[in-house]
């Protein structure tokens, strides 16, 4: 079986949809729930969270990334893929240079100020992923 453009596009779409559902759940429910964690168990919770969320998120982000690279390469003249890939790079940069360091700080000093900072700092990723999926749906409607 040969992998087609449509197969890659579908994987890209489905990984985006999964990540949209996940990021909005994290933004509205999961991160705010950090405020209710027993401070005595905060280190255990944060360790658990980081391991488990990585197990869920990283495969989806990698699929999205590699599909985005392939789609951009195959269709570099389509602004949907260029804008999508730039959005993806911004999401990755924000994740690893802003959100991950906050999680690391929470491992050492679990406090409400850092949790509020995490909630606030996650909005750009939430907005970018939402923006990106709108671009994909615009492209789908053109096909």
Each language-model region and where it sits:
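Interfacial loop at the N-terminal end of multi-pass membrane proteins
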Residues: 3-63, 107-116
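Juxtamembrane boundary at the C-terminal end of a transmembrane helix
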Residues: 136-143
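Short, aromatic-rich membrane-interface segments at the entry and exit
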Residues: 78-83
């Amino acid at each position: 079986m040969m992998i087609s453009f449509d197969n890659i596009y579908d994987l890209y779409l489905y990984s985006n949809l999964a990540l949209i559902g996940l990021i909005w759940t994290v933004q509205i429910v999961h991160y705010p729930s950090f405020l209710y964690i027993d401070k005595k168990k905060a280190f255990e919770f944060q360790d658990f969270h980081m391991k488990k969320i990585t197990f869920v998120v990283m495969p989806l982000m990698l699929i999205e990334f590699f599909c985005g690279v392939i789609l951009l390469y195959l269709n570099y003249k389509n602004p949907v893929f260029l804008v999508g890939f730039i959005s993806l790079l911004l999401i990755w940069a924000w994740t690893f240079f802003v959100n991950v360091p906050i999680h690391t700080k929470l491992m050492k000093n679990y406090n409400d100020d850092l949790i509020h900072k995490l909630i606030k700092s996650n909005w750009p990723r939430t907005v970018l992923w939402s923006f990106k999926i709108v671009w994909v749906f615009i492209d789908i409607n053109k096909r």
